[in-house]
Design a protein with these regions (language model features):
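N-terminal catalytic cores of secreted or lumenal carbohydrate-active enzymes
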Residues: 1-26
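Aromatic-acidic/polar surface patches that form glycan- and anion
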Residues: 2, 36, 96-97
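Acidic, glycine-anchored loop motifs typical of Ca2+
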Residues: 20-39
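Extracellular hydrolytic enzyme modules, especially secreted metalloproteases
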Residues: 40, 46-172
């Protein structure tokens, strides 16, 4: 199960730290509002073809640790699982580096961004290719103002709202 997998990884990392084989990370782990928790841990997992579907624990996703595990003396608040099969993709004989885009998509979930694609029913594309949370693509798209505002990166006052029909000029 996923819980057993995460427990095993955390136990092995802690054992390596205790034995001195790797150094514990002691700074910069609690930069959010989790008070004493590691805000996010990203696990890159080597898996074979077919082991990365949604029926198992190794598909790309964000999950809450809820303080269930302790790493470097701090509880884990959230974690991302990224299977090795999603780091590169081959299409039409070309290999594309998707690692950074998959990792950043899942990290944005840890920061609070929702998916902006449909998973059930009408599979339309609510925001198309225009937001990183709408699709994992190479190159990665930048989050829309909606997502950045939702994450608190843009103050509410800096986001104008159009309330009337008309012609508007967008200034880059």
């Amino acid at each position: 199960t996923e819980t057993e997998f995460i427990t095993e990884v955390v136990n092995q990392v802690n054992a390596l730290c205790e034995s001195g084989r790797i150094a514990a990370i002691t700074a910069g782990l609690d930069t959010g509002n989790q008070e004493g928790c590691i805000d996010n841990v990203t696990l890159l997992v080597k898996v074979g073809s077919g082991q990365d579907d949604k029926s198992g624990p190794y598909y790309p996703h964000k999950a809450d640790g809820a303080g269930q595990w302790e790493l470097f003396g701090k509880k884990v608040a959230a974690y991302n699982v990224i299977p090795s099969t999603r780091l590169w993709i081959e299409e039409n004989g070309m290999a594309y580096d998707w690692g950074y885009t998959t990792i950043s998509h899942e990290l944005l979930h840890s920061l609070g961004a929702p998916d902006l694609y449909r998973t059930t029913g009408d599979l339309g594309e609510p925001v198309g290719i225009w937001d990183h949370m709408a699709a994992v693509s190479a190159p990665a798209n930048y989050p829309l103002v909606y997502t950045r505002k939702d994450l608190g990166w843009i103050p509410e006052a800096d986001t104008p709202v159009v309330t009337q029909s008309g012609d508007y000029t967008l200034v880059p």
